């Protein structure tokens, strides 16, 4: 179980971990014993707590075997029990990995990384997990530091090329929208323009999911690794000149593990 494999890392980050299920206590104990789970599993027969959190799945036919299965996801609570973050997917087959959650909330250490530099900036790119299974959601992160006097463009009301982490399409990969940090407004005096830019070091994050649909899962089952490729694309300017758009390749290889169907 992926969470058990990351339990030590979660504890190291000062966080605890519990899981709640509608299963009976004896069912959860059997499940935990068979998989060596050491963090607490809480039984919620009748789904009373699950319903209070609005996680009871009543969107399917009551006669379906999936009726009542909770919407799978993760809540991050503070010490007062207040929810400060939540991570949920539309499809029950898809899940955030623990490392993706940790990286999203600013905790944890990337599992794999690479560096690159150009005349305009330096970049350290990393991936949350180097081992994953179909259905798991991973984070690709680009920590970008513009060179002195340089800026690159944030999304906004302009026609310059926005800095972006573009990923090559694969039939077994779902690419999620990029997450951008806050930008600055820069006054480009030669044209008297005010545009959205990044001048200081910043982080881009783009999540991807290894698809668990039957066609994708079948394709992934014949592979031992999955390579995710793409590039950091940007246009940089200084206070006088805008340079040609530039593309910095990135590549990460993820070792594949099979789905646990027990």
For each of these PLM feature ranges, what is it?
Residues 102-262:
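Extracellular/lumen-exposed scaffold segments
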């Amino acid at each position: 179980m992926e969470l058990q494999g990351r339990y030590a890392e979660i504890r190291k980050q000062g966080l605890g971990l519990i899981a709640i299920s509608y299963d009976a206590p004896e069912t959860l104990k059997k499940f935990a014993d068979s998989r060596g789970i050491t963090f607490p599993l809480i039984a919620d027969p009748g789904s009373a707590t699950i319903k209070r959190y609005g996680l009871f799945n009543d969107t399917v036919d009551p006669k379906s075997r999936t009726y009542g299965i909770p919407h799978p996801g993760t809540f991050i609570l503070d010490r007062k029990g207040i929810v400060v973050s939540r991570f949920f997917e539309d499809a029950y087959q898809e899940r955030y990995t623990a490392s993706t959650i940790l990286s999203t909330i600013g905790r944890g250490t990337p599992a794999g990384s690479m560096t690159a530099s150009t005349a305009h900036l330096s970049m350290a790119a990393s991936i949350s997990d180097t081992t994953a299974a179909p259905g798991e959601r991973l984070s690709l992160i680009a920590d970008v530091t513009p060179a002195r006097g340089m800026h690159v463009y944030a999304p906004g009301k302009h026609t310059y090329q926005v800095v972006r982490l573009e990923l090559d399409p694969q039939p077994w990969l779902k690419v999620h929208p990029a997450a951008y940090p806050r930008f600055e407004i820069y006054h480009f005096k030669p044209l008297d323009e005010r545009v959205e830019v990044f001048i200081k070091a910043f982080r881009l994050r783009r999540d991807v999911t290894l698809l668990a649909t039957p066609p994708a899962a079948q394709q992934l089952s014949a592979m031992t690794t999955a390579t995710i490729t793409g590039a950091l694309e940007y246009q940089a300017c200084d206070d006088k000149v805008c340079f040609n758009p530039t593309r910095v390749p990135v590549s990460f290889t993820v070792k594949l593990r099979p789905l646990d169907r027990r």
